[in-house]
From Swiss-Prot:
It holds the Pfam family Hydrolase_3. This is Phosphoglycolate phosphatase. NCBIfam families: HAD-SF-IIB, Pglycolate_arch. Catalyzes the dephosphorylation of 2-phosphoglycolate. It is an enzyme of class 3 (hydrolase). Mg(2+) binds at residues 8, 10, 175, 179. Its cofactor is Mg(2+). It comes from Natronomonas pharaonis (strain ATCC 35678 / DSM 2160 / CIP 103997 / JCM 8858 / NBRC 14720 / NCIMB 2260 / Gabara) (Halobacterium pharaonis). InterPro entries: HAD-like_sf, HAD-SF_hydro_IIB, HAD_sf, PGPase. The lineage of its organism: Archaea, Methanobacteriati, Methanobacteriota, Stenosarchaea group, Halobacteria. The active site is at residue 8. Its EC number is 3.1.3.18. It comes from the Archaea.
Length: 226
């Protein structure tokens, strides 16, 4: 079965050392339908990946907070960037740190949410986020502070509308808590074997292989309809 594909980056297209497995490049390019890169990373990362793959710029960034579909030619923003900024300001004012050093390259281009290093205290971050009506999601790579009503499924709904398809037509592949809603909304959701409990619980199937090997396995299983 070939259908539109939505795929996460970290933990799904990568190896355990967090580098992208180059085998996924040709696999994505060969997929004979729409491919959407759906990530918690800020907008330049999925856009850059699409550019270097030579594929249409169909991206869900910042956990659904920023969406771009090339045929539509516009960026759609979901979420509350002012809320994320307020959480950052209050967290730092309380004596905590975002954890990315003097030059914060992680949040530099982030427009609708905030990412905090997982070595930083979580409890005060959650408390401050709650005060501002924001959620904190642990992706296994960072704590993401985002609008409570926005996630990758929100992004997929936007993408599907712009592409003229329905969300249930998609195959989705991911590994983390922030992929759970995406995996549930898609017609078929695969969690790779290294996925956390949230992603596993939301998926229709879990691959035997982990990381990029699991992604490649999921593509094979989707083609074979198994």
């Amino acid at each position: 079965m070939v259908a539109p594909l939505a795929v996460d980056i970290d933990g799904t297209l990568t190896r355990p050392d967090k580098s992208i497995d180059p085998r996924v490049f040709d696999a994505i390019r060969a997929w004979d339908d729409h491919v959407v890169i759906a990530t918690g990373k800020s907008f330049p990362y999925p856009v850059g990946l699409c550019e270097f793959l030579g594929m249409p710029l169909n991206v869900i960034a910042e956990n659904g907070g920023a969406v771009y579909v090339e045929p539509a030619g516009e960026v759609v923003y979901n979420g509350d960037p002012e809320g994320a900024a307020a959480v950052a300001e209050e967290y730092v004012a309380a004596g905590y740190d975002l954890g990315w050093g003097a030059v914060d390259m992680v949040n530099r281009w982030r427009e609708t949410e905030l990412a905090v290093d997982r070595d930083q205290p979580l409890e005060p971050l959650v408390a401050i986020a709650d005060d501002h009506g924001m959620d904190v999601v642990d992706t296994g790579y960072a704590y993401h502070v985002k609008d409570a009503g926005v996630d990758k499924a929100t992004g997929l709904e936007t993408v599907a509308e712009l592409l003229g398809v329905v969300p249930s037509s998609f195959i989705a592949i991911g590994d983390s808590e922030n992929d759970a809603e995406l995996l549930e909304l898609a017609g078929t959701g695969f969690a790779v074997a290294n996925a956390d409990a949230h992603a596993r619980g939301a998926a229709d199937a879990v691959t035997d292989a982990s990381f990029a090997d699991g992604f490649l396995e999921a593509l094979d299983r989707a083609r074979d309809n198994r």
